[in-house]
A protein has these predicted regions:
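N-terminal leader/targeting and accessory segments in enzymes
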Residues: 1-102, 106, 250-261, 276-292
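Phosphate-binding loop of NTP-binding sites
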Residues: 104-257, 264-274, 278, 282-292
Length: 292
């Protein structure tokens, strides 16, 4: 069940939507109809929603969406001529995942621009989930309120989020908007198939991307996350453990009496890639050690 509604920051008219993406609005007189949320399944439709089915749609589903208060729906051109009994405005289009991602992002207020977005991937799901938790703890130690998106434990600051996995692009934008509204400075994503559907990160700007396998090249890491719609752009930093992060982590692990510093090293490498000063990291580690 996916709907962008709890954290909608913007509204959009059907006319603007159709003109922006080159879609066909029927009737054209519905151009000023304003949608207030987006839903990709019938169960998620609320009054004012735009129904954007994630799978093949039929007239029966459109009728259900209409009954539940949808203000419009995006449907394929193949349905033209079969919807005479549908009274809500229809937008005929075959939108790409990129277009849908931009639409959902715009409706949610582009939350990834208000957050430092960290993402961790790898071939071992359990390790990825562990790295996400460790990074969340480390960012919290540095004084950053954090949101986490992970099938094992999603939360916005201290608020646990009851979600159905894997998450769609609509879900991800909604959760990130919730985190931003709650005051999070950063959000951490677990890039695994249990957490995310394909293309779930369309139009999400990832600032720092890391992999639990330090032997992969940047190109291999980018290929690994492409199925989730995670585009590695010029602003994306791909982080991995370095001699510097290993040394800082080893020093901290010794102080704590721990034997494994690999996970802490990756967390340190990621926050260094995000622009946090080494002096600040050392200070936080020292304070944490003294408190413990």
């Amino acid at each position: 069940m996916s709907a962008v509604s709890e954290s909608m920051n913007r509204r959009m008219t059907l006319g603007l939507l159709a003109s922006r993406y080159g879609f066909d609005l029927d009737p054209t007189s519905a151009a000023e109809v304003t949608i207030t949320s987006i839903a990709d399944d019938v169960e998620s439709v609320r009054p004012g929603a735009l129904f954007v089915p994630s799978a093949d749609v039929d007239v029966h589903q459109l009728s259900q969406a209409q009954e539940q208060g949808a203000y419009g729906a995006i449907v394929p051109h193949a349905l033209r001529g079969q919807t005479d009994d549908i009274q809500i405005p229809l937008i005929y289009a075959e939108p790409t995942m990129g277009q849908l991602g931009k639409l959902v992002r715009d409706m949610a207020g582009n939350p990834s621009d208000a957050l430092a977005v960290f993402a961790i991937t790898g071939k071992n799901r359990e390790i990825v989930e562990s790295e996400v938790r460790n990074l969340a703890d480390f960012l919290h130690m540095l004084g950053n309120p954090v949101g986490v998106i992970s099938s094992s434990d999603s939360q916005s600051l201290e608020r646990f989020l009851n979600l159905e996995y894997p998450l769609s692009a609509i879900d991800v934008q909604r959760i990130m908007a919730v985190c931003a509204e709650d005051g999070a400075a950063a959000v951490i994503l677990a890039l695994d198939e249990e957490t995310l559907r394909e293309d779930a990160l369309q139009s999400v700007s990832v600032d720092v991307l890391a992999c639990d396998d330090n032997g992969l090249s940047d190109a291999e890491v980018a290929k690994l996350v492409a199925k989730f719609g995670c585009a590695v752009g010029k602003q994306t930093r791909i982080a991995g453990r370095t001699q510097e992060s290993d040394l800082l982590a080893a020093q901290a692990a010794t102080a704590y009496g721990q034997t494994d510093s690999r996970s802490l090293s990756l967390s340190i490498a990621m926050v260094l890639a995000a622009g946090v000063r080494k002096a600040n990291i050392k200070s936080a580690l020292r304070v944490s050690r003294d408190l413990n």
